Amino acid sequence: MSITTERKQQLIKEYAITENDTGSSAVQCAILTERINNLTEHFKSNHKDHTSRRGLLILVGRRRRLLNYIKKNNVSEYLDLITKLGIRKIK
């Protein structure tokens, strides 16, 4: 259900701007997207888990705010990130 340490390190390495970058907006969005995808898979077999569904909505909102921040500051980075993550544009 949660992402493993190895998977998180892979995401950090893939989306990091510099070598020691673990907290940039792109890395945070990638980790949140992975958590959202895991929860989405969880709901395919546990459709009555309403507490986790609330957690999912909180994660989606947090990712949306981060993506808005990236879009406001650097549009080209935003477009690259959403194509890499496979998510739709924010209106």
From Swiss-Prot:
Instruction: Write out the entry's keywords from A to Z.
Output: Ribonucleoprotein, Ribosomal protein, RNA-binding, rRNA-binding
The free-text function statement in the UniProt record for this protein reads:
One of the primary rRNA binding proteins, it binds directly to 16S rRNA where it helps nucleate assembly of the platform of the 30S subunit by binding and bridging several RNA helices of the 16S rRNA.
Which terms in the GO cellular component ontology are assigned? cytosolic small ribosomal subunit
Single GO molecular function? structural constituent of ribosome
Complex formation: Part of the 30S ribosomal subunit. Forms a bridge to the 50S subunit in the 70S ribosome, contacting the 23S rRNA.
- Identification of the protein by name: Small ribosomal subunit protein uS15
What lineage does the source organism belong to? Bacteria, Pseudomonadati, Pseudomonadota, Alphaproteobacteria, Rickettsiales
Q: Which GO terms describe its biological process?
A: translation
- Residue spans making up a coiled coil are none
A single Pfam family it belongs to is Ribosomal_S15
InterPro entries attached to this UniProt entry: Ribosomal_uS15, Ribosomal_uS15_bac-type, uS15_NS1_RNA-bd_sf
Q: Does the keyword Ribonucleoprotein apply?
A: yes
Gene3D superfamilies, alphabetically?
A: 6.10.250.3130, S15/NS1, RNA-binding (1.10.287.10)
Give the SUPFAM superfamilies listed for this entry: S15/NS1 RNA-binding domain
